[in-house]
């Protein structure tokens, strides 16, 4: 089996990022972005998606940092998926976190698009602006070339809402990136191929 991995380095005048991804990992996470809550959410993605993800990143502000990590992670997923042959392709997950419930449905179609409904009660999660959760998901979907629908259904604690959302994203990505032995070597599309 071909290794489904990617390593990407990105350096701009605003950020420096080094990221590695193994789609067939065991949930190992090493995150160092300097933003503790962001590291925590990225670790949820690795742990509950069973992806090995290492991120080392720094930037001139939190917006540029989150945006460029999302961009780099999306590119890494796209690269690791290759021609996307044999994958399940479409999946969804609904995940509770105490008072909160979030759902994610996605299609690794090769076409980046995001529909995001995130009713946070305020724009702050211990120093992390909640509007950056939306921006992360939209950027990740576009660069990862996946159709993503993400919604927080309800909850009273914004941290729990965000964590349920990242866990749902992880579970849906794990299912969608899984290899189906019945589709070995075949693109899961009536077109016979998926964009990459």
UniProtKB/Swiss-Prot annotation:
Its main location: cytoplasm. GO terms for biological process: L-histidine biosynthetic process. It is found in: Cytoplasm. It catalyses: D-erythro-1-(imidazol-4-yl)glycerol 3-phosphate = 3-(imidazol-4-yl)-2-oxopropyl phosphate + H2O. SUPFAM superfamilies: Ribosomal protein S5 domain 2-like. InterPro entries: IGPD_sf (IPR038494), ImidazoleglycerolP_deHydtase (IPR000807), ImidazoleglycerP_deHydtase_CS (IPR020565), Ribosomal_Su5_D2-typ_SF (IPR020568). Pathway: Amino-acid biosynthesis; L-histidine biosynthesis; L-histidine from 5-phospho-alpha-D-ribose 1-diphosphate: step 6/9. The keyword Glycosyltransferase does not apply. The keyword Iron does not apply. It comes from the Bacteria. PROSITE patterns: IGP_DEHYDRATASE_2 (PS00955). One of its GO terms (cellular component) is cytoplasm. Its EC number is 4.2.1.19. Keywords: Amino-acid biosynthesis, Cytoplasm, Histidine biosynthesis, Lyase. Belongs to the imidazoleglycerol-phosphate dehydratase family. This is Imidazoleglycerol-phosphate dehydratase. The lineage of its organism: Bacteria, Bacillati, Chloroflexota, Dehalococcoidia, Dehalococcoidales. The gene is hisB.
